[in-house]
């Protein structure tokens, strides 16, 4: 089976989680081709249509799998090949983009949503109709969709909540244990040597779930949490306060007494894995999310997690000791959860939870193949 992946192209590659999903599909014996979109905005995407049509004729694909709503809209402007579109959150949560995503939803042969909250936003009245007499309000006014459908990650696509829509978060690669990963080489250093050159054993490190220049991730809230934590839970001066930290000159680090916040930017995938294995916690303060990959990746590394209640984080981390979801955006409340996570002082059972939910890339690729075969 030939699958043509259509997604935004960044320097000749797709987003890492798309690349990893493609590799998992190839491991199942599928021929996976790519069409990278370099245009920006709706007009930039529409200008890609002639080239995309040529690629479709050339590749003779059985299925087109588009990632994000604008890519789905573009892919559906041809009607020769069935299109599966995955909506990742930003294409649902941003109203100006949602209107284009809704057109893609109507045209696509099958839609994949990565979180239940996105389902309610995207499908609106249809979602509530499908809830039927199980619909009930929650404290924040959103629909309770725990019983939205008999579909689970262990079900077949035909059990999805409609024949055209499936709830399926993206998967993650399950890394080898740190005892095996640490011997891999990064340039002139092993990962173990690299991480010890970056992290001081005397300091507790908190990995921020994004870049400091990404306003959607709300880095200012995260920095406020660090300030509150240090003023509330420690009166000790940081060991590095009067000497230079190994990464003190980096814009990617905020140092404040006993804990330091590290920006997740500019690292390779192996380096991110090393940080997740060695940092004391992951902190997420995003304003909106779908099914954030960084949370699932941290879980796979056993990293404790503190997050505001966003996307599907609460559902993913449910039952994972050392992980805390805060129902408010108050820095003091998040700082208290961070105190608990740091006091946990160990690795979580997140890896086992990821596998139990069927969220390894291998498991998700199997579900995708079932969807593809349902359409051809």
Describe these PLM feature segments:
Residues 56, 105, 274-279:
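Short alpha-helical donor nucleotide-sugar binding micro-motif in glycosyltransferases
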Residues 66-71:
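Short His-centered aromatic/hydrophobic patch
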Residues 109-134, 151-165, 172:
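A short, active-site helix/loop in glycosyltransferases that binds the activated sugar's phosphate group
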Residues 160, 168-172, 184-217, 223-230:
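Conserved donor-binding/catalytic core segment of Leloir-type glycosyltransferases
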Residues 181, 329, 343-374:
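A charged, aromatic-enriched C-terminal amphipathic alpha-helix characteristic of glycosyltransferases
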Residues 287:
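Aromatic "clamp/platform" in nucleotide-sugar-dependent glycosyltransferases that forms part
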Residues 304-307:
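Short hydrophobic beta-strand element within catalytic cores of glycosyltransferases
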Residues 319-331, 339-345:
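Conserved acidic donor-binding segment of nucleotide-sugar-dependent glycosyltransferases
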